């Protein structure tokens, strides 16, 4: 094409220069000025890498003054174009705009504009864009979206709770699984789902100070959620950046003490518009009707302002009824306002639990039982389901399951309370107790005797506590530097045990930090044993370092010496040997100690070693725990109740361990009480809750579905293709691990999630669980999501040209592959992607408008095509521009039908699902007061907004490929 002064051209290789103007032409060269950057370029006339910019009727163009015009006619005179049309701002028609006055900052965003302007992408980028659209759409439609990306084992009961709660609007629930069943992971899964779907954006986690760092690391390592830890220092810093310091971060962790200490700080927390509040160790919030604690009041105030609340707590039996009611009251004060009424309700759950047990047993039901079930469910037309459940047909089992679901929906706190027990969850190790009876040294005997004389006025409780720790009595008289460890037989036994088990990791727990520090020194100096220490005097980072050193396999510490605080919230299930150097004062603390090793996922039986001194409170307590409560070898939900009931007698025996008369009877009575309470707990409400929380076959099927997805080879192929195109180096390290590092030729200079030093990744869940240094890559990992965003939010791969070598077709035959996207714009919290994620519609048109896409599959077709360089491609486009325009118009005429079908299907699905959920909850509202009014209102509002957004759904051309047939 001849060059003329004033013509507008665009550079094929430097499209960022914008629109160029021909300012000089001679026999061999042409000079273009690019006004938007002020740069000149000199090109050879014969084969210059530039493309003539020509607009067509229907296009919208912008003048250098900023006003826009819809083109209706194009005139050419002496090689220069004049566009005639209607101005969009004044609606003036017949306006002429010469091409020299076009806006130089012109950006070609439509695929066809980019193609005609010579902005042609590599063929592999077009293929990647289509795959990104296709896979992205498929992932949004997965029923377990949000549950696959976490680095956790696929444990059915955890997945069941997360799947149920994570999909709710502003969930307000109590997670009260027994110790070791993974409440933190359940909470993380719920957060991950809510954040990924857009249901929540701002999250506040409040935990005891000792657990802050653990939550921070756990959320990042397992769920790729980067929380900010707020303490006094961080809060003061953030005050310089915003009126409300908490507005500076979306995801925040702080301690309960930090939140409670300052009135202004609590007000700032309440005003920060969180979507979700998570409170760990919620059983520490003390409440009574007359005097709730300040901690309880602080959380109560926050819970009034935050729509979604997750409370993590000990089991209801351990708490006692009043304390349990107090947690539920935080979640829904309107529903749980009267403690006496709550107690009465709980008594009425026995018949429901019996009915559920009856259905699950599979026995034939009598007419009376059928009538009772009908009355309990209170639904019309329930008769056929009852008959099916009582028949021998194939549908009997599913009918019984449906009736169980209905019963649980309608009765009790199953919507707000989740509680799994070890009885209902398989996969726990055995616990084996080894008691080591040791003689009481004369030094201790003397100290105890003197202490008894001098402390005669002490209360029985104080004397009992003293008698548990004889080394402290000795130090009271001999001074803090008294070397009790030189004669205490427990120390000698511990050193012998550790030296004979050098290959074993051993957790040693004692009540006081001073004991742990003194033991570390003795072990190091006498036997060269590597021991890490973990106590309340250390900073969080120091504790983390100690825990990490203990976790290291080859060069790590053999022993971790913990004070009592070390047994709250920290998990060391890679170890299976525990030594209790002394015993805690109550059964809850004992269970907490053992719970650090006894967790789901523990591979070995747990060996619990208790060296104790005879004729001390230790010898009394070891018998009471083991023979009276069976608390060492099994979890003991009855412990707190029995402890409270025999407290005074037990204290007297502990204070005077020599006086054992009647102690055998006490143990016998406690054991009988324990067995009776245990039997009682296994009936009634607990059974109902357990069935609901566990999820049964449904939860198992969910875990299996996700496991199948873990083997998705499409992800690996797509990820490697994505990394190649972004410019990320990949180095296979074996053992299913790959090291990714940035290259010098990245699509973007800083890719989110990829550090300068690189990262190690794996696509294998088992490898990710074993290797903390490897990131677990799934469709939900930020690296993949950021990659999808990078490709799909820009124009990468949106226009390309390929050659098809096929002698069955005439040379020069044109095909145009069009990728349309059908989508609806809506706020993220509506979660419209459940029904209509941005969905690609592929068309492959010839010049007559025949759509060959159904006959010619994308990947097969893509392998038959050859790439064209950009310069040759521009020439081809110019030669067939009018034909391509005509095919595009045929495509526009055809897409409407396909797009409308997708939109209608999405509307029907949304209407059906959201209306069904609303109807179900409205029906249940009549019989189950645990359904909140605001939840019903939110679902109805959500349904209306979703339907309105789907009514506004549309489609657009996202990418196109021009294919030219050749025989060479």
Curated annotation (Swiss-Prot):
One of its GO terms (molecular function) is ATP binding. ATP binds at residues 177-184. Its EC number is 3.6.4.-. Keywords: Activator, ATP-binding, DNA-binding, Helicase, Hydrolase, Nucleotide-binding, Transcription, Transcription regulation. It is an enzyme of class 3 (hydrolase). InterPro entries: Helicase_ATP-bd, Helicase_C-like, Helicase_RapA, P-loop_NTPase, RapA_C, SNF2-like_sf, SNF2/RAD54-like_C, SNF2_N. PROSITE patterns: HELICASE_ATP_BIND_1, HELICASE_CTER. NCBIfam families: PRK04914.1. Belongs to the SNF2/RAD54 helicase family. RapA subfamily. Interacts with the RNAP. Has a higher affinity for the core RNAP than for the holoenzyme. Its ATPase activity is stimulated by binding to RNAP. This is RNA polymerase-associated protein RapA. The gene is rapA.
